[in-house]
């Protein structure tokens, strides 16, 4: 069957830059799914996205569906003919519906009986017949939260659509989508080139647009922006300050990226660089430049959509745009410094944290008390932690943060230093929100860690305490992020903290505000659940996690040590047999209602068989090793020691009848198994590793 490459392009008005990439990806995903559902064969589907277009390109698309033979089963032969062998009404009706005579029907014989059968030849539809429905299906499934109407059309899309190009090879496929009839017209650059032009072949889409000053390939355009930024910064011996999010947003704003450099008055550098950077990156999509020491330069880069004949005018225009924004930041900074953070505490009384949980001032007081407690647990300065916790939210009332919300915490640090607060206190105001995202830095001191943990725990306990648990994708108080933050701080900084203790203290600090009696258990379980998800993301096997989770250790560092130990144990040659033995032991003890406890009494005088005597000796030796290793959380040592018991355990089960007739002997042997089980449970429930 003939194949050609196919292009579908929607020519639009400027698309929302933050949604452009996801729209392009979704268009390709949905169109590919539609092609597959229609049984149209193809090699691959790729996508293009630029500010004024969305397109999909299908390589090796078949010109139509393959013909099919569809088997249509009729009534059973016993019901298809009467006693004289004449077709019944059921058989005649079925045959008529399929356009055949009963005599022409074939027979389908199975072990359940015999039926009439018609094999219908169904010719496949051509790609020209199918494309309209497939395109409309894909477009209707794009992630568009707020579609809009335009002109006199009843159709809706994220932005008005003005051109529709659908080519199968060099042929136009006539379809109607979003009120437009397809053709071969494509929009070039708004200012360069010919404007609209006709595309001769699907294969020439990207190259023809490039001649018209449009880079339609999103990733290629992003790479070009990146390279120009790096080259321009290198020429200035500076480093561009951007991340992938900013880069993608810039690439979504331009069709033909051209990087230029501009500058601002050096006097603005007296303002904290974070505020200036926020203004440049978030408000204007400019790229700040840093020197080798990380200091901000008064030169910056910006990306335009044109190759200007007079670049100086474009540069001057952008400098005029940024100047008043920087002047605002300078004014806010200087005016804010006239008021101390401590004097802003009372104004926090006017801001609600949550209706049932009180104001931000009350939250600050709780954070202060909890920070001091945590500091006492990790040998940090309690006085500084309490002070930092009290001032943690005061910068929210400053003019700078009200204007530029993303600099909260950062400005708290600068204002605290201006007020003469201790350096660790100031740093804690900045680091209280860490980690803000996956891979973000962690608090750098015990004081900062105490405040960061206190803030997150106060939110977790408070929201759970009034019964507003996160459901599905809804997590308005970012409790999942808070839980992950707690876990990262405690584990990566190796802090000796117990979730039960932390949550209990946070509940106490709330006084009588909380109404959920299950808060303690629910918060600890929620955080541990996030821990399990994090560990799965790190490629830890689910059964390893479940084995540790069964013991419910609530010290995150202890939990992690157990997981790593079980993960190593699972790779040992003895692991499978020992897991199976643990499962067998657990089942025996459960059936006999024997509870595994820390203290197990075994009567040596009742040990009659050599195999049970040998097991007892080995278990007592292993018990001593376990007792030595537990305080240092050396679970790898524990499991390595217990792994040496494999042969003696196998020998016991091969030669000893646990359920002896003598009740005393039976209970003694059950006690022996209880000790074995207890030693393994010191680390995890190894029986969970046993294969079903």
Curated annotation (Swiss-Prot):
It holds the Pfam family DALR_1. It is found in: Cytoplasm. GO terms for molecular function: arginine-tRNA ligase activity; ATP binding; glycine-tRNA ligase activity. It catalyses: tRNA(Gly) + glycine + ATP = glycyl-tRNA(Gly) + AMP + diphosphate. The keyword Transferase does not apply. Its main location: cytoplasm. One of its GO terms (cellular component) is cytosol. Its EC number is 6.1.1.14. Keywords: Aminoacyl-tRNA synthetase, ATP-binding, Cytoplasm, Ligase, Nucleotide-binding, Protein biosynthesis. The keyword RNA-binding does not apply. InterPro entries: DALR_anticod-bd (IPR008909), Gly-tRNA-synth_bsu (IPR015944), Gly-tRNA-synth_heterodimer (IPR006194), tRNAsynth_Ia_anticodon-bd (IPR009080). It is an enzyme of class 6 (ligase). One of its GO terms (biological process) is arginyl-tRNA aminoacylation. Tetramer of two alpha and two beta subunits. HAMAP family: Gly_tRNA_synth_beta (MF_00255). PANTHER family: GLYCINE--TRNA LIGASE, CHLOROPLASTIC_MITOCHONDRIAL 2, GLYCYL-TRNA SYNTHETASE. Belongs to the class-II aminoacyl-tRNA synthetase family. This is Glycine--tRNA ligase beta subunit. The gene is glyS.
